[in-house]
Amino acid sequence: MSRLILRGARFPGDIAIEDGKITALGTIEVLSGDSVLDCEGDIVTAGLVNTHHHLYQWMTRGEATGCNLFDWLVHLYPVWNELTVEDVYIAALVGLGELAATGCTTASDHHYLVPGGD
């Protein structure tokens, strides 16, 4: 079974990964079939967890900036009321892509909109 060896990260030693699990830490001998990833100077961490997200709000990022919470909600609730099922779907795809690209592997979405009242 091949392993992924993370070498040179800002951790004192190598990290071996097999089947998505860390199997060894420290000085690791590279075996035939292993892949080695040069992580020189990088920080290696487990996947990040976002426990509170509103993915649909990606569609209105940049709107009503500089407002307090109440004014922000007053401005955006009418906008969110017009979102379609497709809008929410696209926002979720983009939002999940951004989370994945920044190291998030688990997210909990707090979705309370019902597009079209369905």
PLM feature segments, named:
Residues L55-G62, G117:
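Short, function-defining helix-loop hinge/capping sites that tune catalysis or transport
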Residues M59-I90:
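Active-site gating loops and adjacent loop-to-helix segments of metal-dependent hydrolytic enzymes
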Residues A46-W58:
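Histidine-centered catalytic micro-motifs
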